[in-house]
Amino acid sequence: MAADSREEKDGELNVLDDILTEVPEQDDELYNPESEQDKNEKKGSKRKSERMESIDTKRQKPSIHSRQLISKPLSSSVSNNKRIVSTKGKSVTEYKNEEYQRSERNKRLDADRKIRLSSSSSREPYKSQPEKPCLRKRDSERRAKSPTPDGSERIGLEVDRRASRSSQSSKEEGNSEEYGSDHETGSSASSEQGNNTENEEEGGEEDVEEDEEVDEDGDDDEEVDEDAEEEEDEEEDEEEEDEEEEEEEEEEYEQDERDQKEEGNDYDTRSEASDSGSESVSFTDGSVRSGSGTDGSDEKKKERKRARGISPIVFDRSGSSASESYAGSEKKHEKLSSSVRAVRKDQTSKLKYVLQDARFFLIKSNNHENVSLAKAKGVWSTLPVNEKKLNLAFRSARSVILIFSVRESGKFQGFARLSSESHHGGSPIHWVLPAGMSAKMLGGVFKIDWICRRELPFTKSAHLTNPWNEHKPVKIGRDGQEIELECGTQLCLLFPPDESIDLYQLIHKMRHKRRMHSQPRSRGRPSRREPVRDVGRRRPEDYDIHNSRKKPRIDYPPEFHQRPGYLKDPRYQEVDSFTNLIPNRRFSGVRRDVFLNGSYNDYVREFHNMGPPPPWQGMPPYPGIEQPPHHPYYQHHAPPPQAHPPYSGHHPVPHEARYRDKRVHDYDMRVDDFLRRTQAVVSGRRSRPRERDRERERDRPRDNRRDRERDRGRDRERERERICDRDRDRGERGRYRR
């Protein structure tokens, strides 16, 4: 009995020691893996020593490693070689200690239920995710566990696995507080699975220990143990169901991987930035990552990566947090068909053709409404300074590209091409103007063709600088800032392609505009469609400055010479060899060269210098012209020929020919006379009001003088009348006095 009471006291002291040392603080929310690992190692070493003692004593007082959650403080007290003592024949103090122990167990059971519910609810979101790397790791951990009863090694491995798993996944790092709350209860859930598998493998031995313990347990302890075992059985059933679900999901995942291998996908769906373990978790078939964190495992991983020819499929755990990278990375990694690639390549080549030799201008808008209006109507208005600049660029450049950006938006809103110069007087466009600015301050309206209506963030163009704006980033600039050709081209190519735009029509417009502009301004060479005219075959009228009208020519048909009434060409009529005058003309005193090529003033001067014309018929040749006194040398000889010898041998022309020739050649003179008269009339009409004004101005002083003289005469007459009246009055008064 003395030995039994001593053993009972030792057991109670062990239980109290476990309670005081191993119960974690429930309010502590931080998880320290090192301190937890130290506690687990102490606990494992105690269990190992106690088990060895129980084997040495041939299981006289065997202990039980009950299948309970390690997170419960009850498991540590039950598994530490507990001595079951009946309450019969105990003292009052011992009985009170037993009651205190039972109340503490019940409290801990209630706390464990709450913690278990919270931990299970925190794990559910991870199970519902489509990616299943965490489930595969759990299965691999269960396979990799050895059946050895060394609890300290298993617990250390589990802690290392938890640490490496948290470092591999950014999601698990974000949710480390939830995992920490699970660990605060005293141990990790994975060690619970290790104890369960150990109990399954050593089932026979545990059954014997349980039978011996039940025989020795008291009534109160049996009730507590039965309640705990029922809860543990329920938890085991839940865990088995979870494990079955995990195994099914693992099989589905492995089947998917086999299908992908059979299809022979030789491309890498992994982004270059996701190679680091902190962003993604990668898997390989036939390999298990235990996450032990040792150097050997790291070397094996590196060797596997070098030996592998096909890149592994990497599952991005970031989920919905990658909202910005969705548009870029999703399109990069999706496998495009050859037709889609060809269409995009064709679009890029067309865009490069449009941007070739273009001029680029940055357009800054004050609000999104104006840009939306421009996208809808295809028009734009700017200040007169920029309007003049854009008009000059449109005339000189092949294309003018406007890159739009709303102030303080952080993005470019698209780019368009000018399709016309600015025009005024059309239907007004209701722009949204800032305070203090009226629509009259804007210039004309440009028509534009949009090339891309999609947006481009400034962050995508941070590497581009504008040499024409002091090498500042291309996003910086005032409204109308011109961008250098290479910089503008690269900026436009950064925009996402806009499939709603038909670049073929835009190219057609460009060619039409270039053709229209090339026709009026041919640079030194005639166009292909314009007939080439030989410069050497120009008519002499083209060189005549004074001859603004085309002179009539008489071109006779070849049969004209055989007519019976044929007369010689009047252009070759006889010319007086002495005076070089055209004979028998109406104005015969005018020289031929003056008559043909001289101006009207020369003609009038010659006409006034000569005498009156001769009569038409019945008179000797040249009777009205005074013959100059003959030189003695020419008295008996004919005078020498003059300047035009070919005309000297012709005979006199009859009157009909002279009249016909006169009708032709007098046309010009009649026109000149008509113009002179009309000009005189018009100038006279214009001069008449001037002359009237001058006459009025001249007459004004005369009229003023006349008026003044009249006024003076009237004043004189009035004074005379007054004087006469005075004299009369005086005379009459004198008469009355007498």
Swiss-Prot record:
Residues 1-12, 50-59, 91-115, 124-144, 151-163, 170-185, 258-273, 527-566, 690-738 have a biased composition (Basic and acidic residues). InterPro entries: YTH_domain, YTH_prot. Residues 318-328 have a biased composition (Low complexity). Residues 63-90, 186-197, 283-292 have a biased composition (Polar residues). The modification Phosphoserine is found at residues 35, 118, 120, 146, 311, 318, 320-321, 323, 427, 438, 548. Interacts with SRSF1. Interacts with SRSF2. Interacts with SRSF3. Interacts with SRSF7. Interacts with SRSF10. Interacts with CPSF6. Interacts with KHDRBS1/SAM68. Interacts with TRA2B. Interacts with KHDRBS3. Interacts with EMD. Interacts with RBMX. Interacts with ZCCHC8. Regulator of alternative splicing that specifically recognizes and binds N6-methyladenosine (m6A)-containing RNAs. M6A is a modification present at internal sites of mRNAs and some non-coding RNAs and plays a role in the efficiency of mRNA splicing, processing and stability. Acts as a key regulator of exon-inclusion or exon-skipping during alternative splicing via interaction with mRNA splicing factors SRSF3 and SRSF10. This is YTH domain-containing protein 1. It comes from Rattus norvegicus (Rat).
